[in-house]
């Protein structure tokens, strides 16, 4: 819902989602609507996921400890990288919540998010965009492929397990 719905609209939609057995209801309310998010999460069976736009550990902790979400979705590129996101995931794990990183930009972020999630005991999934994106698929010499909802990681390669296509980097290069 992209943090754009009113509480009443989110509740109404959430009850329909409950009947349809929808897996997640992502970011129904504003990120800073802690009371509304907690009440919504309490009143629905559909799990509330969020908030990819949040960037601070302290605010994620407030969302988690206040039971405003059921699934935490930090974006590694926005929320402080691996180190800060591991702290966020640890707070979520301490509250028996899953972590599902958000990865909607380049192939590098997707690789980082996949490896990050794979290394978590409470890693649920990675939210990734399946639309065409030259910086996601084209940037990698060997793009990730989802098969039946899963992406297999190659543990024989170092680091993030990716190699960048220099011709694509050249295409987007800007001299400053």
Question: Where in the sequence are the language-model features?
Answer:
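Alpha/beta enzyme core
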Residues: 7-24, 31
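Active-site mouth loops of central-metabolism enzymes
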Residues: 1-7, 49
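Shared catalytic-loop signature of beta/alpha-barrel
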Residues: 21-24, 30-150
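C-terminal extensions of enzymes
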Residues: 140-176
């Amino acid at each position: 819902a992209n943090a754009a719905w009113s509480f009443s609209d989110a509740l109404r939609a959430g009850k329909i989602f409950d009947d349809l057995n929808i897996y997640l209801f992502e970011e129904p309310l504003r990120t800073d609507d802690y009371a509304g998010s907690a009440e919504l999460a309490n009143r629905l069976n559909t799990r509330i996921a969020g908030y990819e736009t949040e960037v601070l550990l302290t605010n994620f902790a407030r969302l988690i400890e206040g039971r405003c979400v059921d699934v935490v979705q930090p974006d590694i590129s926005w929320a402080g990288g691996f180190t800060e996101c591991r702290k966020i995931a640890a707070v979520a794990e301490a509250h028996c919540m899953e972590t599902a990183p958000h990865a909607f930009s380049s192939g590098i972020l997707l690789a980082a998010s996949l490896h990050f999630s794979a290394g978590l005991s409470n890693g649920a999934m990675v939210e990734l965009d399946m639309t065409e994106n030259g910086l996601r698929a084209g940037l990698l010499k060997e793009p990730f492929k989802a098969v039946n909802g899963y992406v297999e990681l190659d543990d024989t390669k170092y680091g993030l397990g990716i190699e960048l296509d220099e011709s694509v980097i050249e295409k987007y290069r800007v001299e400053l």
